[in-house]
């Protein structure tokens, strides 16, 4: 039955435990049957607007509630729900919220380990009892007068993790599953005028064994709470199917609705009708679909029709219609209306591949937790969600996995509207109950344990029923990292029996093959070579990486390798980066400084530190440099050079449904970063098609032997869209063009150098500069140009970077410690000075602390002040890989202006530079610091031809690579960065640390706990290296 209409009669569990402890079979009491997200309206016009909160049938209970906190069940107020209980002196708390962020209890971040393990040793299904906080909420409300004699329900959109509800002192019900709605029929509990609601929430319950997601462990009423009423006869639920025919041309619309006669009064001659409206609110059907009916208690009705050539829905073109369902009385007057958005699309496996509307789909995806740095998961607003979606769309992301629980319903509506494919994931993760490589199910939950079967099926049902009508959802996921077992087969069967329009996904079968509960082969953090190996095995299932490119700290190296594979092998159909946003909470240090906190910062144990910092965007919602790489790798267009000298290039359109002529095509040529010419036109390349592009430009001539001409091809929005304005660049590619070589340049004549030296120092003087070299240190200790001192400390070989999170994960800081010591401890073995008329050569042989490598530095100082530095390193092949090879020096903090011609404008690395443009870039040194959660290597620039570091007067150094260098200029040294666990703890800097490198090893990113940087981006010790560049004073 859909209703009770009567008060619930409570019976205590037979085992003597409360519902929330040691009772996995009890996951709800008196909860209403799950249904699609709906809200009754009084008119068609209201239904078309579909503004639920403006409906006369809606009443919010968000706001201030009275609140009592207890550390465990024994400390709670036992009779707080009684009508005579006085709660007026209790604290107040805002709903929705996490009580941990409102001054009670503490937030706790842990990944795999269950949060209570250090307080209590437990086995499932027992819940903690020693420390298991309980939040008790009370408030009053007066139902709207218009609701008299109508059914009334209360809807909790999200409560973590288990809760009881009382109305006016009477027990209404109980529910678990933190991330799907729990609704209760409270009609029979209400009284005239003011009513009192009491809610008791448990931080942990036996259901918490199913909610071991990698996130902050927080609790409370964290999503909207509201009342809603309905007419006595109303549409309780409805299901919409809007697929395409076999030719993907015409649409098939079918609607099924459950009609409920709540009070079972006689009803005759009702009419149920359906009308479809287009994006302009114009009727699509010539006449409404309708059927006449009478309803004594409840009834299901179905209607269907054929739609000629509807506008199709896809992430590229998210064309939506509005379906309005109306229930009318015998006189033809509206009793109520409901509505939802409809998108005509067909998602299926065809010829072994996942397809959307007949075309092979590639999921350019990301995993997303619901998170806000101030609110946690609580009260995430529509504006918060739109902010995320705009950034996703702007960076060519077309798919999102709701890791690892159903999101707020508004999220799916926005994905429908803006165009994102969704993997909707069941609220299930039990990572802490099993270990990798275990052979059997052992202690894995839910496994094949019968006591958990109905619990997990209820989670599937709650998600499915709420979300079934969203066109953006293409895949149901059974959960995350919960091993395998028969219960997953039951879950799989549930979805397959309910829904033929979507696929079912579960990565866990990779670890336990006894139950094949997935339509898709899915893995996590598999290296590109292993992904390719699957493609070569003649596989039967399409493949995705449901998690890959672990974006912890400075990461996402070699992302392009995966996308080369997705292009090469049709069976490989994309992946979802882990993850979208750093989960860091705003906190205040003892001195009042605001900072972003991670695990352990609240005294929480156990914790997993900054492992919550895996985002493509920072916790404050701003973009990190990593997402620029994602945008480039995910871009829907590919250009390749055919014959650049003749202006010939190949164009591949990766869109499935969009011709490239929908965009503006702009191409430019720049000389050393300065614009030479710019042209705009259109590219006419069919969806999923290729063509040849011919551009007309001359053979450019160099004026200087270092001149460089760069062609940039750019695809830009031709008009405003919902997610970006006209002119926004969607895709680009760059090519260095061939040019007619210039004659070698000859240095201008300058007066001869003056060289003075003694045992300790060497002083070189030119027309407007003086440089002092310390022979004992083997360094220049001063470089004075035009009465401005440019050096704070001299040039020294450096082989170390501030360890990244990936470095820590693969133990580089232990394995390669010798190179850290070699950077800090260097001894001069020999200094040779060779004065000439126009230059002086100073050769330094250094003994490094590790004694297994030979290091030489040669300085050639010319009479115009320019200095050429040649660094060579000959390591022993028995030594570990080298984090970086270069020279480090410092300047005064006043030299804060940085200009470079190389890749940028954001930081980039040997294995993460695809999305960084070769151009002329400018910024302050301070701006080069990337605020990762834990201070680490950041700010690097690759393929740098030249750079200047100057003060306000324009004094400083011009650095030129021979031919290129990597450059890093920050207010901190690598050793300072890695000495602190938060950026706010770093002391104010009085210098600029400049590192001019031959190379720095790549940042990696296959995972952040074991994977090393790929070999082709690693500086191995089995060869010699040379780093050459020049510095010239400005």
Swiss-Prot record:
Stored InterPro entries: B-gal_small/dom_5, Bact_Beta-galactosidase, Beta-gal/glucu_dom_sf, Gal_mutarotase_sf_dom, Galactose-bd-like_sf, GH-type_carb-bd, Glyco_hydro_2, Glyco_hydro_2_AS
Family according to the record: Belongs to the glycosyl hydrolase 2 family.
Active site per UniProt: 481 (proton donor), 547 (nucleophile)
SMART domains cross-referenced by the UniProt entry: Bgal_small_N
One biological process term in Gene Ontology: lactose catabolic process
GO cellular component: beta-galactosidase complex
Organism per entry: Priestia megaterium (strain DSM 319 / IMG 1521)
Catalytic activity: Hydrolysis of terminal non-reducing beta-D-galactose residues in beta-D-galactosides
Organism phylogeny: Bacteria, Bacillati, Bacillota, Bacilli, Bacillales
Entry's Gene Ontology molecular function annotations: beta-galactosidase activity; carbohydrate binding
EC number assigned by the record: 3.2.1.23
Pfam family name, one: Glyco_hydro_2
UniProt xrefs under SUPFAM superfamilies: (Trans)glycosidases, beta-Galactosidase/glucuronidase domain, Galactose mutarotase-like, Galactose-binding domain-like
Stored PANTHER family: BETA-GALACTOSIDASE
Protein name per its UniProtKB record: Beta-galactosidase
Keywords on record: Glycosidase, Hydrolase
Top-level lineage group: Bacteria
């Amino acid at each position: 039955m859909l209703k009770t209409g009567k008060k619930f009669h409570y019976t205590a569990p037979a085992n003597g435990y409360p519902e929330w402890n040691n009772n996995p079979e009890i996951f709800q009491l008196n909860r209403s049957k799950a249904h699609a997200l709906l809200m009754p309206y009084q008119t068609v016009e209201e239904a078309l607007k579909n503004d639920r909160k403006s409906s006369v049938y809606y009443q919010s209970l968000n706001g201030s509630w009275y609140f009592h906190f207890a550390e465990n069940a024994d400390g709670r107020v036992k009779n707080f729900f009684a009508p005579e209980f006085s709660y007026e002196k209790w604290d107040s708390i805002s709903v929705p919220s996490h009580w941990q962020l409102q001054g009670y209890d503490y937030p706790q971040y842990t990944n795999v380990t269950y949060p209570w393990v250090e307080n209590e040793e437990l086995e499932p299904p027992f819940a903690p009892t020693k420390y298991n906080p309980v939040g008790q909420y009370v408030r009053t409300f007066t139902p709207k007068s218009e609701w008299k004699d109508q059914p009334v329900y209360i809807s909790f959109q999200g409560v973590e993790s288990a809760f009881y509800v009382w109305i006016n002192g009477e027990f209404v019900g109980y529910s678990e599953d933190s991330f799907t709605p729990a609704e209760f029929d409270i009609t029979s509990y209400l009284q005239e005028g003011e009513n009192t609601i009491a809610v008791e929430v448990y931080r942990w319950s036996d259901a918490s064994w199913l909610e071991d997601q990698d996130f902050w462990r927080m609790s409370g009423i964290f999503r909207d709470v509201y009342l809603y009423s309905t007419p006595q006869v109303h549409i309780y639920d409805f299901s919409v199917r809007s697929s395409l025919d076999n030719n993907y041309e015409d649409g098939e619309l079918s609607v099924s609705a459950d009609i409920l006669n709540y009070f079972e009064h006689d009803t005759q001659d009702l009419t149920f009708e359906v009308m479809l409206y287009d994006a302009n609110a114009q009727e699509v059907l010539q006449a409404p679909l309708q059927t006449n009916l009478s309803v004594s208690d409840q009834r299901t009705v179905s209607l269907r029709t054929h739609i000629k050539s509807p506008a199709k829905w896809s992430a590229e073109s998210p064309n939506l219609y509005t379906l309005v369902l109306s229930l009318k009385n015998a006189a033809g007057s509206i009793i109520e209306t409901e509505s939802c958005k409809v998108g005509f699309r067909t998602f299926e496996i065809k010829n072994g591949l996942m397809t959307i509307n007949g075309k092979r789909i590639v999921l350019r995806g990301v995993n997303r937790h619901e998170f806000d740095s101030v609110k946690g998961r609580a009260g995430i607003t529509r504006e918060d969600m739109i902010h995320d979606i705009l950034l996703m769309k702007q960076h060519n992301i077309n798919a999102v996995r709701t890791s690892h629980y159903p999101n707020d319903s508004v999220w799916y509506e926005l994905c429908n509207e803006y165009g994102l494919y969704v993997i909707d994931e069941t609220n299930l993760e039990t990572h802490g109950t099993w270990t990798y490589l275990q052979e059997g199910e052992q202690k894995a939950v839910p496994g094949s344990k019968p006591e958990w079967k109905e619990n997990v099926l209820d989670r599937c049902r709650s998600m499915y029923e709420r979300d079934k009508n969203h066109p953006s959802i293409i895949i149901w996921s059974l959960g995350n990292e919960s091993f395998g077992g028969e219960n997953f087969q039951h879950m799989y069967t549930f979805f397959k029996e309910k829904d033929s329009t979507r696929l079912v996904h579960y990565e866990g079968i990779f670890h336990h093959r006894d139950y094949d509960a997935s339509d898709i082969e899915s893995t996590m953090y598999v290296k590109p070579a292993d992904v390719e190996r699957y493609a070569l095995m003649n596989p039967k299932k399409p493949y995705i990486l449901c998690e890959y490119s672990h974006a912890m700290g400075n990461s996402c190296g070699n992302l392009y390798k995966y996308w080369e594979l997705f292009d090469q092998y049709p069976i490989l159909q994309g992946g979802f980066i882990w993850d979208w946003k750093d989960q860091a909470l705003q906190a205040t240090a003892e001195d009042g400084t605001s900072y972003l906190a991670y695990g352990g910062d609240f005294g929480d144990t156990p914790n997993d530190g900054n492992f919550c910092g895996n985002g493509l965007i920072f916790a404050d919602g701003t973009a990190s440099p990593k997402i620029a790489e994602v945008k480039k790798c995910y871009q829907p267009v590919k250009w390749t050079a055919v014959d650049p000298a003749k202006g010939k290039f190949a164009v591949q359109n990766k869109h499935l449904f969009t011709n490239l002529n929908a965009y503006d095509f702009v191409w430019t040529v720049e000389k050393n970063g300065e614009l030479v010419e710019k042209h705009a036109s259109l590219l006419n390349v069919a969806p999923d098609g290729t063509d040849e592009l011919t551009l007309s430009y001359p053979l450019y001539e160099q004026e200087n032997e270092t001149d460089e001409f760069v062609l940039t091809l750019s695809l830009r929005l031709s008009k405003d869209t919902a997610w970006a304005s006209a002119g926004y660049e969607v895709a680009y590619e760059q090519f260095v063009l061939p040019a007619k070589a210039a004659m070698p340049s000859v240095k201008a004549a300058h007066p001869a150098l003056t060289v003075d030296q003694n045992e300790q120092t060497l002083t070189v003087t030119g027309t407007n500069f003086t440089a002092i070299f310390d022979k004992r240190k083997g360094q220049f200790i001063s470089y004075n140009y035009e009465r401005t001192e440019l050096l704070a400390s001299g040039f020294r070989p450096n082989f170390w970077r501030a360890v990244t999170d990936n470095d820590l994960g693969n133990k580089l800081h232990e394995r390669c410690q010798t190179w850290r010591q070699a950077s800090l401890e260097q001894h001069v073995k020999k200094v040779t000075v060779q004065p000439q008329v126009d230059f002086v050569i100073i050769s330094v042989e250094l003994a490094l602390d590790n004694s297994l490598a030979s290091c030489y530095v040669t300085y050639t100082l010319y009479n115009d002040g320019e200095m050429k530095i040649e660094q060579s390193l000959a390591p022993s092949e028995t030594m570990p890989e080298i984090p970086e090879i270069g020279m480090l020096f410092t300047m005064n903090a006043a030299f804060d202006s940085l200009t470079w011609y190389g890749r940028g404008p954001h930081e980039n690395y040997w294995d993460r530079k695809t999305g960084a443009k070769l151009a002329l870039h400018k910024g302050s040194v301070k701006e080069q610091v990337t605020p990762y959660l834990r201070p680490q290597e950041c700010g690097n620039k690759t393929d740098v031809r030249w750079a200047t570091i100057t003060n306000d007067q324009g004094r400083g150094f011009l650095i030129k690579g021979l031919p290129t260098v990597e450059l890093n200029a920050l207010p901190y040294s690598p050793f300072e960065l890695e000495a602190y666990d938060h950026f706010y703890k770093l002391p104010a800097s009085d210098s600029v640390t400049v590192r001019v490198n031959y190379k720095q090893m790549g940042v990696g990113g296959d995972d952040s706990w074991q994977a090393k940087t790929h070999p082709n981006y690693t500086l191995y010790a089995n060869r010699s290296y040379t780093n050459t560049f020049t510095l010239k004073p400005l």
